[in-house]
């Protein structure tokens, strides 16, 4: 996937969700630190609407994460993580906002 960076090794049970929108890569330091102990995904937001970003995150999680996953969201990414969990509760085990 073009809109995804991975850190560590599978299984990828954690996804770090950046702020912005438009701050792709912002969560890379967090992802690198967490990857010492677990596989981490860093989805990069490319859609322009909130609905599009929720569906994009859903698609990334379904394709690449060990579900249900832990979402670590910062700023805009915290809100997006919360919305993803609300719309797709089966995909999310925990939220860290």
Regions found by a protein language model. Give the residues of each.
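Short alpha-helix within the catalytic core of nucleotide-sugar-dependent glycosyltransferases
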Residues: 28, 54, 86
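Active-site loop/oxyanion-hole signature of alpha/beta-hydrolase fold enzymes
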Residues: 41-72, 76
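Conserved hydrolase catalytic core segment
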Residues: 67-97
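Short Gly/charged-rich anion-binding patches and loops
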Residues: 29, 56, 80
């Amino acid at each position: 996937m073009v809109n995804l960076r991975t850190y560590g090794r599978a299984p990828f049970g954690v996804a770090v969700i950046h702020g912005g929108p438009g701050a792709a890569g912002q969560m890379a330091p967090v992802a690198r630190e967490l990857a010492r102990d677990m596989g981490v995904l860093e989805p990069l937001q490319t859609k322009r609407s909130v609905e599009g970003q929720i569906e994009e995150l859903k698609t990334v999680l379904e394709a690449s994460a060990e579900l249900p996953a832990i979402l670590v969201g910062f700023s805009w990414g915290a809100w997006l993580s919360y919305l993803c969990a609300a719309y797709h509760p089966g995909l999310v085990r925990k939220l860290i906002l």
